[in-house]
Amino acid sequence: MSKKVAIESTAEAYLELLAARGIEYLFANAGTDFAPLIEAYAKRFATGQALPRPITVPHEVPAVAMAHGFAMVTGRPQAVMVHVIVGAANATGGLINAARAGVPMLFTAGRNPITEAGFRGSRNRPIHWAQESFDQGALVREFVKWDYELRNFSQLETVVDRALAVSAAEPQGPVYLTLPREVLGEAHDVFEYADTPRAPRPADAVAAPEAVQEAARILAAARRPLVITKAAGRDPGAVPALVALAEALGAPVVDQFHTHVNFPQDNALHGGFDASPYLDEADAVLVVESDVPWFPALKSARPDARLVHVAVDPLFTRYPVRGFAADVALPGAPRLTLAALAAALRGAVPASVAAERRERVAAAGRERRSAAEARARALGQDQPIDMAWLSRCIGDVLDPRTIVVNEYDLDASQTCFTTPGTYFAAPSSGGLGWGLGAALGAKLAAPGHTVICCVGDGAYIFGAPTAAHWVSRAYEAPVLWIVFNNRVWNAVKRSVLSHAPDGWAKRTGMPLTELDPPPDYELICQASGGHAEKVEDPTKLPAALARALDIVRRERRQVLLNVMCKKP
């Protein structure tokens, strides 16, 4: 069935269609290209039409990260709009993050007015000449699944429905739609559209049965099977399927470079966060949604190990170079493929063998977790604060209704995440500044949950904190921000030491890595009405965390803890 609504412009029809297609938020960093859209919003507000809710985000980095954070929690794409090509340039790092993380997103930007006169949206500012580009889509084309320019009111429904369908199809990712001001500003009286989009969205697929059986034979025949995963938990439904598979095999599951809760940490078969100790023995390795299961330059699977890869795109076809071998590659939705594999393995491994393996993994896990806790508690008096102790203190206050967004510094070995969808780490694409906006998006997606954002001081600066704290206050999205302040870009420092272990930089100092003297980050949060504390005494850290969580939950106000950590 179709629906017919009275409108005044293409912009109004566009907002009507986004709302009808389930877009709840438009995260926006506005410019002169927004004029028709803002006028359309004003009319919709006056007539009681609130969706998609516009969120003003005063910097493109948190704007894109907010859409990313909302989608990673809910699985539902949201819309972002930035100011023509200059806004898209500022947003590109976030788009790369979304692309590599497989996050659906309708990314849009205004299109500089094409005409110099004669139309309602024609050029009337100096920037409208200087901002014109020959091919605006070229800026981000490599990192979006599809890009297009809306050229005519009559194609609005087709274009938007196709954009959303392409974004949601696996492997998911952002799409880019440019919106010329003249087209948005065109006057129209009526917009008619289908109640339900008919753009094809492919159903989730499962790998071919014969390929699943071959993979099952490889795993069942192994004496030391191993599972490595990075992002199986992107689909929470894949987690119980992975648990069933691991239990059928009695195989350890390693969260290598993990970005999600992929496997409950309290399960006896959780194998920790480093696959290296297992690779020498493993004669079959199941790699699940992992672009980089190990570093070939440092440690690889045995040459004779049989390798099975499971992912929506097991070849990671958008990566120019990726040379990880596979005997069987199983494309499709991991929850379906893993469930099929678990069913094929049922009874294939004797129960006594699986139980013996399970006990061996469990014993190693108990020892590993005990050692991690002992290490953290032994460092609990150190000042400046050790990150292991900070991570342990955070782990002690977590519950299933708390979501953690981690941009690098939280040590997961000091925590115990068991519920899918409660932990998200920065994409390995490394577009810094992701954490602040992603945490805000997560809070909008799950308003009944507590959201904690763990972020390094360098990443905090990249995240446009003035903008992020303002958004938190303006839209009542309280987050507990924890800055792991070690006053250095440690990833850069580690890279230098890896490149030249005994070189000049180690002996004489490292330019381009220092963040000393540190700003008083707590003042940035306070400027937007938040509570903030600098924490220097490790013995006062648990009380500071308890105080912070009470304020976030009871007062619904953001809190920042600037934790002074050891400088490496």
Residue spans of the language-model regions?
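Phosphate/pyrophosphate-binding active-site segments
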Residues: 1-5, 154, 304-408, 520, ...
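Serine-centered coil/turn micro-motif
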Residues: 266-267, 402, 486
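Active-site diphosphate/adenylate-binding microenvironment
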Residues: 11-22, 32-42, 362-448
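N-terminal alpha/beta PP-like core and its mobile active-site loop of ThDP/TPP-dependent enzymes
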Residues: 2-345, 349, 397, 469, ...
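A glycine-rich phosphate-binding loop feature that marks nucleotide/adenosyl-phosphate handling sites
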Residues: 178-183, 409-411, 564-566
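Charged, low-complexity, helix-prone segments enriched in Lys/Glu/Asp/Gln
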Residues: 70, 112, 353-379, 442-443, ...
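Thiamine diphosphate
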Residues: 116-131, 279, 322, 329-331, ...
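Conserved short loop/turn motifs at secondary-structure junctions
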Residues: 230-235, 378-379, 456-458
